Design a protein with these regions (language model features):
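N-terminal, charge-rich interaction modules
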Residues: 1-22
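Short acidic, S/G/P-rich loop/turn micro-motifs used as interaction or catalytic elements
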Residues: 17-20, 55-57, 82-85
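Glycine- and acidic-residue-enriched helix-capping/strand-helix junction motifs
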Residues: 20-32
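Short helix-loop-beta junction
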Residues: 35-46
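Short beta->alpha junction loops
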Residues: 49-58, 110-112
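Structural motif
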Residues: 55-64, 118
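Mid-chain, well-packed structural core segment of small domains
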Residues: 62-97
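Ser/Thr/Gly-rich flexible loops in soluble cytosolic domains mediating phosphotransfer, phosphorylation
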Residues: 90-128
């Protein structure tokens, strides 16, 4: 029996909930991300994450570019924190990086961290 993890087909780009400034509890979002990623494993679909902080510790464009260039992605999911109105500039930069570095990838948007698999599945080609 082959127990190797499937090759990643999906990249999830989003905010690291533990590195978003402000007085808020990141635990529910982190738990939602973990639950959403578990659904990929349950479906046998490989996934990688590209989570970055807004605390100034990341060169966001470099981090995202490195992740996009790592392999050919079938789907890239852009998380909701990146799409919030106060992050419009960041959202535009990420979409343009996607256009340049993963032009063949479908772009998907989740509505919550827990439904990230559903967002990707809308665009995944059937296996085989």
């Amino acid at each position: 029996m082959d127990t190797a993890a499937p090759l990643p087909r999906v990249l999830v780009i989003g905010l690291d909930p533990y590195r978003v400034p402000g007085p808020w509890d990141p635990t529910p979002v982190a738990e939602g991300i973990a639950a959403g990623l578990a659904r990929f494993a349950d479906a046998g679909v490989g996934v990688e994450t590209c989570l970055f902080g807004l605390d100034g510790s990341d060169d966001v464009e470099a981090v995202v570019t490195e992740a996009l260039d790592r392999r050919r992605w079938e789907v890239v999911v852009v998380g909701g924190g990146v799409r919030s109105p106060d992050q419009l500039d960041l959202f535009e930069r990420i979409i343009n990086l996607l256009r340049r570095h993963a032009p063949d990838a479908a772009i998907a948007f989740n509505s919550t961290p827990a439904d990230t698999f559903d967002a990707a599945a809308r665009w995944l080609a059937p296996p085989g």
